[in-house]
Amino acid sequence: MADDNQNEVKDEVVADIAPFDPTKKKKKKEVVIQDTTDDSVGKLAEKAEACTASEGQESTFAGLKKKKKKPIETSILNEESGDAVEDLNERTGEDEEGEGIVLETPSYPWEGSDRDYTYEELLDRVFTILRENNPDLAGDRRRTVMRPPQVLREGTKKAVFVNFMDLCKTMHRQPDHVMAFLLAELGTSGSLDGQQRLVVKGRFAPKNFEGILRRYVNEYVICLGCQSPDTILSKENRLFFLRCEKCGSGRSVAPNKAGFMARVGRRNAGT
C-alpha cells in the first residue's frame, strides 16, 4: 500500500511540472512610474496656506506700535572721523613735501575773525600769490657764483691771471672788454699769451683782481631791476646798452675809460 501511495504522489508531481520550453521568454516586471505632479501641487498648496497664515499674523499685529530705536550720537562719530581725516591730510602733506606739491590752499591768520590784518601778513600774502602765478620772479634770487681769480707770478715784474677765460665765459662777456676794464682799473698794460692767460705788468695780488671783477659784474653784468645775471651787452651808436633777458629792462652803461698811466720812459734834458 505504501508503494502505491508513493507512485501516485510522483505521478501528481510530474503532472504539475510542465515540460521546459526554451523558446518562451521571461516576463519583465512592470515599472510603475510615480506621478510627482500631485506631490508638487500639494507642496504649493502648503506654502500658500503658510503665507496666508503669516499675513493674518501681520494683520493682527498691525495695530501694535513698534519700539523706537535710540538714535546714535553722530556728533562723536563725526568728530572722530574729522580728526582721522585731518591726520591723513597731515601725513599726506608731510609725504608730499619732498616733491614740492601743495595739497591744501593757504589759510591766512585773519580768516574767521573780524580783526584787521597787519602789514607783514599782507606782504606774505602778496609773495605767496606771486610764487603761485610767477615762481621765477618771486622765488629766491639766483646768486652768481664765480670762482676766485688764480694769480701767479712770472719773474719779478709780471703777474699771470690763469683762469681769465673761464671767468669771461661765466659772465658771458667778451674777453677784450673785460681785459680793457681790468687794465684800466689796474693802471697797467698786459696781453694774452699762447695759453689764453692774461699777463699783466706789475705785482698784483689776487685780492686786487677780485675787487675789480666785482665792480665789473655790478656795472656790466647784473640787472638793476631783477638782479638777474642773464643780460646781454650790446653797442649801439657808440653807446653800450645792457638788456635783461628775464624782465626785459634795459639801461645804458658807461664805456671803458683808461685809468692813470704812469710815464716810465726817460725824459729828454730839454723837456
UniProtKB/Swiss-Prot annotation:
InterPro entries: IF2/IF5, Transl_init_fac_IF2/IF5_dom, Transl_init_fac_IF2/IF5_N, Transl_init_fac_IF2/IF5_Zn-bd
Keywords: Cytoplasm, Initiation factor, Metal-binding, Protein biosynthesis, Zinc, Zinc-finger
Gene3D superfamilies: 3.30.30.170
Short name of one Pfam family: eIF-5_eIF-2B
Main location group: cytoplasm
Subcellular location: Cytoplasm, Cytosol
Source superkingdom: Eukaryota
GO cellular component annotations of the record: cytosol; eukaryotic translation initiation factor 2 complex
Biological process terms in GO annotation: cytoplasmic translational initiation; formation of translation preinitiation complex
GO MF term list: mRNA binding; translation initiation factor activity; translation initiation factor binding; zinc ion binding
SMART domains for the chain: eIF2B_5
Zinc finger region(s), C4-type: 223-247
Complexes and interactors: Eukaryotic translation initiation factor 2 eIF2 is a heterotrimeric complex composed of an alpha, a beta and a gamma subunit.
Family to which the UniProt record says this protein belongs: Belongs to the eIF-2-beta/eIF-5 family.
Cross-referenced PANTHER family: EUKARYOTIC TRANSLATION INITIATION FACTOR (PTHR23001), EUKARYOTIC TRANSLATION INITIATION FACTOR 2 SUBUNIT 2 (PTHR23001:SF3)
Described purpose of this protein according to its UniProt entry: Component of the eIF2 complex that functions in the early steps of protein synthesis by forming a ternary complex with GTP and initiator tRNA. This complex binds to a 40S ribosomal subunit, followed by mRNA binding to form a 43S pre-initiation complex (43S PIC). Junction of the 60S ribosomal subunit to form the 80S initiation complex is preceded by hydrolysis of the GTP bound to eIF2 and release of an eIF2-GDP binary complex. In order for eIF2 to recycle and catalyze another round of initiation, the GDP bound to eIF2 must exchange with GTP by way of a reaction catalyzed by eIF2B.
Name listed for the protein in its UniProt record: Eukaryotic translation initiation factor 2 subunit beta
